[in-house]
Amino acid sequence: MLKSLPPTMSVHSKLYEGKAKILYTTDNPEVLLADFKDDATAFNAQKRGSILDKGRINCSISSQLFKKLEANGIRTHFIDSPAPNQMRVKAVKILPLEVVIRNIAAGSLSQQTGLPVGTVLKQPLVEFYYKNDQLGDPLLTSDRLLLLELATAEQVDVIKNLALQINEFLRRFWQQCGITLVDFKLEFGLDSQQQILLADEISPDTCRLWDTAETDPNRRVMDKDRFRRDLGNVEDAYQEVLQRVLQTVDTQN
């Protein structure tokens, strides 16, 4: 377990650059530094832009939520946040899966099934997508997932159970923030002991968040849909989410 780390751990080379973060190696092979970017993308990077302070905001929100999840028994890759837009994380091998948990119909679920946007689901829906930009991150059946050997059947069961636990916690937390958790995406990885850890981030980039007190279908949006759908005020929405998270954490402490 990585408990205590030197505050001035040196950063080495760039390991990987994704759409939202850059990962750097450090002088500890089991620790990476994640640098959160202000870049914004949508529709598998077909739409690109920038959201002022997004890196700082998403890193701050993710850090708070990872700490809360750890305190509730969910193992994550989070270690600490040495700077507002940086997070030290445990090195994991990311499973090529995007795990989407849905509480309310929206986005592709509504488009593909005809369920009206806003339909509350009788129980949370857990979906697995193939994390592959070239293929457009397709929805997987359980048989296809196993056929492609993206994870073992046992790992899939563990991940699904973790996803439902995380959803239950986050749904309650966002509710305390006056925010409805419509759906969200998670990624998981394997550490050096082959243990499954929650990885990536939890932020308005990866969650569909609606202002609970707002009924207007456009004004209620507090997530990356504001960027996707050109609704404007993206920075204000992200900042508002951060403020509510910090206020809720402060109240709970």
What kind of feature is each model-predicted range?
Residues L2, S10-Y130, V245, V249-Q252:
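Active-site loop/lid in soluble adenylation, ligation, and acyl-transfer enzymes
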Residues Q46-R56, L139-L162:
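Short histidine-centered catalytic/ligand-binding loop motif
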Residues A71-H77, F169-L181, T251-N253:
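Surface-exposed helix-capping loop/turn segments at secondary-structure junctions
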Residues D80-N85, W174-L190:
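A short glycine-rich, hydrophobically flanked beta-strand micro-motif that places a catalytic Asp/Glu
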Residues I101, L181-D200:
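Conserved metal-phosphate-binding beta-hairpin within the catalytic cores
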Residues T119, I202-N253:
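C-terminal helix-cap and adjacent tail motif
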Residues T119-G136, N167-T180, S203-R208:
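Phosphate-binding core of ATP-grasp and ATP-grasp-like enzymes
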Residues L150-V182:
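A long amphipathic alpha-helix within ATP-dependent nucleotide-binding catalytic cores
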